[in-house]
Amino acid sequence: MLQMLIAAPNSGSGKTTVTIALLAALKARGLNPCAFKSGPDYIDPMFHRSVLGVESHNLDLFFSKPQIVQNLYNKSAADHGAAICEGAMGYYDGLGGTSDIASAWHLADTLNLPVLLVLRPKGASLTLAAQVRGLMSFRTPHHIAGIILNDCKENLYRILAPVLEKETGVPVIGYLPPMPKAAIESRHLGLKTAGEIENLQKKITLLHETMKKTVDFEKLFSVFACPAPKVPKEEFPIPNVRIAVASCLLYTSPSPRD
C-alpha cells in the first residue's frame, strides 16, 4: 500500500498543489486513494474532496491523543490502495511556532509515515541540499524518504535532482513545472476555498496530466510502499446517531470528525 505524508520547509512551497496532483494521479490509476490533513485546517480538505469526491480526514494531535489519531488513520485508510496526508506549515512547526508538538513531523512520527518533502527552488540550488540535511538532522527519526521539486523548470530539475540525491542520500522522485493556468490563488488567510476558485476541475486535470509526465511513479511506489494499517477494534461501540451539521459558504470550518 502506498502511504506518505507530504511536507515542506515552509508554507507556500506547494504542498496542496502536489497533494491534489498526486491524489488525482492515484485515482486515475485505480488505487482508490484516501486523504488526510495534519491539524484542524478546513480549506485543504476541500481540495482533497474536490479530487476524490469523498471527505478528507483531519488528524489533530492537539485535540486528540496519539492512539485516537492512529486508530482514526488506520480505520479510514483501510480498504484503500493509497493514503496521502498533507502536512501544515513547515515540517517541524507545531504549537505556538516554538514546539514540534502537533506539527507535521509529530504526525509522521506518530503514524510512522514516510515523508515526501516538497522543495520550491526559487533563488537557491545547492543550498537546498543543506536545507534538507538540516531538516534530517533536527529530529530523530526524521522520516524524510523522498523529494519532489515544485515550480521547477525541466532544465533546472535535470541539474538539481542528481546533486540533491548525492548530497542528501534522499531520492528525488520528480517535479512539477511552473503552471500559471493551474495556480491555486491565495489571500491573507492562506489559500482560497475550493468553491471560490474558477475552473478548479480543469486545474486539477492539468496538474494530473503534467505529473504523469514529470514524476517517476515506479520510483514513488518503491520508496513509499508500506504495510497496510490494521483496523482497530472498537472497544466502546457507539450506536448510530443521526446528527445534522450546517454547511454553507459562511460556515465551512467543521471537519467530518467533529
Identify the meaning behind each predicted range.
Residues 1, 236-241:
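A short, charged/proline- and glycine-enriched loop
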Residues 2-17, 23-111, 119-146, 151-158:
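ATP-dependent carboxylate-amine ligase catalytic core
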Residues 22, 26-27, 164, 257:
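Hydrophobic alpha-helical packing residues
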Residues 34, 242-244:
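Conserved beta-strand elements of the Class I
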Residues 115-118, 173-175:
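Short hydrophobic alpha-helical runs that function as membrane-insertion/retention elements
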Residues 126-232:
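Internal gly/pro-rich beta-alpha loop/helix module
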Residues 251-258:
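Conserved small/polar residues in nucleotide/adenosyl-binding loops
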